[in-house]
Amino acid sequence: MAHFPGFGQSLLFGYPVYVFGDCVQGDWCPISGGLCSARLHRHALLATCPEHQITWDPIDGRVIGSALQFLIPRLPSFPTQRTSKTLKVLTPPITHTTPNIPPSFLQAMRKYSPFRNGYMEPTLGQHLPTLSFPDPGLRPQNLYTLWGGSVVCMYLYQLSPPITWPLLPHVIFCHPGQLGAFLTNVPYKRIEELLYKISLTTGALIILPEDCLPTTLFQPARAPVTLTAWQNGLLPFHSTLTTPGLIWTFTDGTPMISGPCPKDGQPSLVLQSSSFIFHKFQTKAYHPSFLLSHGLIQYSSFHSLHLLFEEYTNIPISLLFNEKEADDNDHEPQISPGGLEPPSEKHFRETEV
C-alpha cells in the first residue's frame, strides 16, 4: 500500500475514507510481538504503539517512520463545508446491474430478522434512507453477492463513518472472490483485515466458505456447533468453544447455532439473542459494541479470531429464515437449565415496515 505525506490510501479507491474508528485495540506490535498498547489511529489506516514509538501498516506489517505523516486528513464535519470536488471523490462507483432479489427474501427478513435499532428498511439496490447518512457522498450502496444458487443481500459500509456501522446486518454472507465488482484489485489479505475490523467493531457475523482466504492472517478452524431453538436465546454450555460471537450455519433445513457461553445456562453472546441480553442488562443499547465497550462481552485476540464458515456452498433462502424455527406461537418457551427466563415473544417479533 502506497503512502504519501499527509495522505493515507484507502482500502478501496485511494482516497481518504473513515474506516476503523477511534483507537480500536487489537493490532500486534512488531517489536514485542504482542498487543502492548498498540492502537489504531483515529481515522487513520496506520497503527501505532506509543510504548515503542513505532508506526506500521496493520495490513502488511511494514514499519513506517512518523505517524503524523500518514494520518488521513479529516473531512469537514458539516456537509455545507464539503465542496463538489470532495463529494465527487467520496462517491463510490455505481454498480451497473442490480440483481433480482426474490420478494420472499425481503419479506422474511422484515418479519424474522432482529433488526438493529428496531428498524431497518431494505432498499433493493438503492441507497439507504437519507436520515442514516446525512451526506450523500458517504452513503454506500447495497451489495449483493451470489452464494451458490442464492442471492444474498450484503451491506459493506466501507465508505461510511464508523458511527453508522451499527446499521450493518446481523449476518454477512461473504465470498471474497465474488466482491470484484465492488472491491477491485484488492488483495485477499486486505479484505481479510477489513472483515476482521468490521467483525471486531460491529459484532457482525461474517460467514465465509472454507479455505476462501488463503492467507496466514487468520488460522481458520471449524468450530463445533450445537443445536437449539433460536427463539429462546440460550445455548448449551460448551467449554471447549473458543470462537468469539456466534456462528450461524444452516444444514438440512435446521438452524445450527454455536457460540461461547460464559457459564452453564447463561445466555450466549449471540446477536440473535441480543434483545434478551440487553433486557437482562437493563440497557437500551441496540448494538453489541455497547456491551463490548463496557466490558460486558469480550472478543478473542487477533490471532485466535476464527472466521465463520458454512458447511455447504449453497444456502437456499428458505433456510435463511426458517418460519418453523422462528415461530414460537405454538408452544411456550422452555426454561433453560440455568433458570434464566427466556425472552418474551415481543423481543423477537418485528412489526411490518
Curated annotation (Swiss-Prot):
Positions of region (Interaction with CREBBP C-terminus): 312-319
Protein keywords: Activation of host NF-kappa-B by virus, Activator, DNA-binding, G0/G1 host cell cycle checkpoint dysregulation by virus, G1/S host cell cycle checkpoint dysregulation by virus, Host cytoplasm, Host nucleus, Host-virus interaction, Inhibition of host mitotic exit by virus, Metal-binding, Modulation of host cell cycle by virus, Oncogene, Phosphoprotein, SH3-binding, Transcription, Transcription regulation, Zinc, Zinc-finger
Motif (Nuclear export signal): 188-202
Entry keyword Metal-binding: yes
PTM-bearing positions, type Phosphoserine: S300, S301, S336
Database matches in InterPro entries: Tax (IPR004120)
Region (Interaction with IKBKG): 106-111
Region spans: Transactivation: 289-322
Gene: Tax
Isomerase keyword on record: no
Biased composition annotated in UniProt, kind: Basic and acidic residues: 343-353
Residues with Phosphothreonine modification: T48, T184, T215
Organism, scientific name: Human T-cell leukemia virus 1 (strain Japan ATK-1 subtype A)
Further information: HTLV-1 lineages are divided in four clades, A (Cosmopolitan), B (Central African group), C (Melanesian group) and D (New Central African group).
unnamed zinc finger segments: 23-49
Protein name per the record: Protein Tax-1
Consequence of substituting T184A: Slightly reduced CREB and NF-kappa-B activation
Residue ranges of the region described as Interaction with CREBBP/P300: 81-95
Function field: Transcriptional activator that governs the viral transcription from the 5'LTR via the recruitment of dimers of host phosphorylated CREB1. Together they bind cAMP response elements within the viral promoter and mediate high-level viral transcription. Increases host CREB1 O-GlcNAcylation to further increase 5'LTR transactivation. Modulates also the expression of cellular genes leading to the deregulation of T-cell proliferation, perturbing the integrity of cell cycle checkpoints, the DNA damage response and apopototic pathways.
Region Disordered, annotated ranges: 326-353
